[in-house]
Amino acid sequence: YSFQGHGAECLPWVFELAGKYDIKVIAMEVTHDTQVDDILTALDDAGNPTGVMLQIGTRNTQNFELLKAVGRQTELPVLIKRGFGITLEESLNATEYLAREGNSNIVFCLRGMKTNLGDPHRNFVDFSHVPAVKHLTHLPVCIDPSHSVGSRNRGPDGILDVMHVTAQGIIAGANMVLVDFHPRPEQALVDGPQALHLDELSWFLDDMSIAREAHDKRTQLARQYNG
């Protein structure tokens, strides 16, 4: 029953604003094969002011006809999220439908697993699988801390839970972070409770930098001990 978006009619506005504010890339979720053509047409009509990454949501990871349709276009890269209620192997196998159709520009996104074992978070945080995905595939790995945590809660240390799990994923080697920000989360039409305020962006980026430095130091140490 959540907000479903404005559909294709909003695409010209989105691309106009992306160009105006010099946004480099937009992740756009597609749920039907016709939406791919809608996006490509609107992007071309707007003069290609921004990059677009098509997104396959968790509930469509095993929508094989959609995967094949998205895979047949090779202009836009694809972000595919871990599937809803299926194994990691099954989710990774879904990426083969994209690659087999011709699109090998794929990013795999860990976004938490739906189980009450993750309570009080929205989903069970699965960022320990970052190195596992890299071991099993050649794919860059994205983490989605917003959908994993699902709230703006913070610990006794004053650090937001979203930032804690983001650091976990970055230290584990994540290549990309997908996180929700909103100027007024309380008025957001979707996912407001998990969105961070825009004035927290600098804090978030600084915290990410600390986590990245920790990752780099750990990999340097590993090279030292592994010869």
Regions flagged by a language model, labelled:
Residues 1-11, 181-195:
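Glycine-rich, proline-tolerant flexible connector loops at the mouths of alpha/beta enzymes
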Residues 26-38, 97, 181-185, 211-227:
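Electropositive, surface-exposed helix/loop patches at the edges of structured domains
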Residues 116-118, 151-153, 182-192, 221-227:
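Flexible glycine/acidic-rich beta-alpha junction loops that bind and position SAM and/or redox cofactors
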